A protein has these predicted regions:
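Active-site HxH/HxHxD metal-binding segment of metal-dependent hydrolases
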Residues: 1-65, 142-143
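Short phosphate-engaging motifs
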Residues: 23, 107, 133
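Catalytic core of the metallo-beta-lactamase
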Residues: 1-8, 45-126
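Residue-level signal for the nucleotide or nucleotide-sugar donor/cofactor binding architecture
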Residues: 22, 102-103, 150
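Accessory terminal helices/loops
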Residues: 110-123, 127-191
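Short amphipathic alpha-helical segments
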Residues: 23-26, 98, 137-138
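Histidine-centered catalytic micro-motifs
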Residues: 11-21, 68-73, 125-132
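Short secondary-structure transition/capping segments
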Residues: 32, 58-64, 86, 90, ...
Length: 191
């Protein structure tokens, strides 16, 4: 922020994270920004709660909110011109897991189908880049194994049969991300 001389207005979390601590509270304190999340979140420190179809305006630009529950109950994606920021709803070559608190394979199927209805040209920027940092919806529709599953029942069976290990610090992350008060622990701690 300092390097570019940028003025931050908002910090947006696409969902409540169970795998790491969000930096929203730290950024709010340091830069005076408003924290934005979907209205379904149970995080108490949110300044702006958005819903499907809302716009997060900055200058003459806006991010359009698409509510995409499934990975979590408060998951959302953000459309900006020819880009879509998918959080953990859609990953490159995969999608967010649905076995963590608030996850639903049924809702994830519905949310992914909603994203599939968008134009192939949208560039996809996921919350995690396990493979690459950017893709297109067209490539994901063709190559992403989660998007090529033909039926809802088959998708739900696949997602509910997967039992990856829980995130190592799930309890710590959920507590941090659902606690209203930022507790000063020293610069960088808690992120």
């Amino acid at each position: 922020v300092e390097f570019f001389g940028a003025k931050l207005l908002y910090v947006v979390d696409t969902h409540t994270h169970a795998d790491h601590n969000s930096a929203c509270k730290l950024m709010r304190e340091r830069y005076g920004v408003k924290v934005v999340m979907h209205r379904a979140t149970d995080a108490p420190y949110i300044d702006v709660r958005v819903d499907d179809g809302d716009e997060i305006r900055f200058g003459k630009q806006a991010l359009k909110v698409i509510y995409t529950p499934g990975h979590t109950q408060d998951s959302m994606c953000l459309l900006f011109n020819d880009r879509i920021f998918t959080g953990d709803t859609l990953l490159i070559g995969g999608c967010g897991r649905t076995d963590l608190p608030g996850g639903s394979a049924e809702q994830q199927w519905d949310s992914l189908r909603r994203l599939q209805a968008l134009a192939n040209e949208f560039r996809v920027y996921p919350g995690h880049d396990y493979r690459e940092a950017v893709s297109t919806l067209g490539d994901e529709k063709q190559k992403n194994p989660r998007l090529t599953i033909a039926s809802r029942d088959e998708f739900i069976k696949f997602m509910t049969s997967r039992k990856p290990p829980l995130p190592r610090k799930i309890q710590e992350a959920l507590e941090w991300n659902r606690t209203p008060i930022y507790r000063q622990r020293g610069l960088g701690e808690g992120i």
